[in-house]
Amino acid sequence: MKIALIAHDKKKNDMVSFAYAYKPIFEQHELFATGTTGLRIMEATGLVITRYQSGPLGGDQEIGAMIAKNDLDMVIFFRDPLTAQPHEPDVNALLRLCDVYAIPLATNMASAEMLMHALERGDLDYRKLRK
């Protein structure tokens, strides 16, 4: 499956820890990330990640384009709800596309862990049928 990993600045450490904890599962899938998030995960875990631009420079929109083309299966986006983001419209557009195209989306560690366990059990294999 194709999985996108995104994290706002104040959540990047959480994302790196999360990726490290679930590395054995992530290694079985194709990973994509916004620029800095992807770099930090790669440096900490050695995971292979296709990196796009940083979120404020269009990375969220690049991942959104993958969703619109049915070329992404899951999004894990650790958002910082307490800090205003200069690219908030891009973030909202990405979340909207996940809803429009029924892409599993986690926006915090608790929901991300649920998605990872579902992925490990094969509960998300229906995505393969939609291709």
Swiss-Prot record:
The active site is at D60 (proton donor/acceptor). This is Methylglyoxal synthase. Catalyzes the formation of methylglyoxal from dihydroxyacetone phosphate. It is an enzyme of class 4 (lyase). Pfam families: MGS. SMART domains: MGS (SM00851). Keywords: Lyase. Its EC number is 4.2.3.3. GO terms for cellular component: cytosol. Residues 1-131 form the MGS-like domain. InterPro entries: Methylgl_synth, Methylglyoxal_synth_AS, MGS-like_dom, MGS-like_dom_sf. Substrate binds at H8, K12, T34, G35, T36, T37, S54, G55, H87. It catalyses: dihydroxyacetone phosphate = methylglyoxal + phosphate. GO terms for molecular function: methylglyoxal synthase activity. The gene is mgsA. It comes from Bacillus cereus (strain ATCC 14579 / DSM 31 / CCUG 7414 / JCM 2152 / NBRC 15305 / NCIMB 9373 / NCTC 2599 / NRRL B-3711). It comes from the Bacteria.
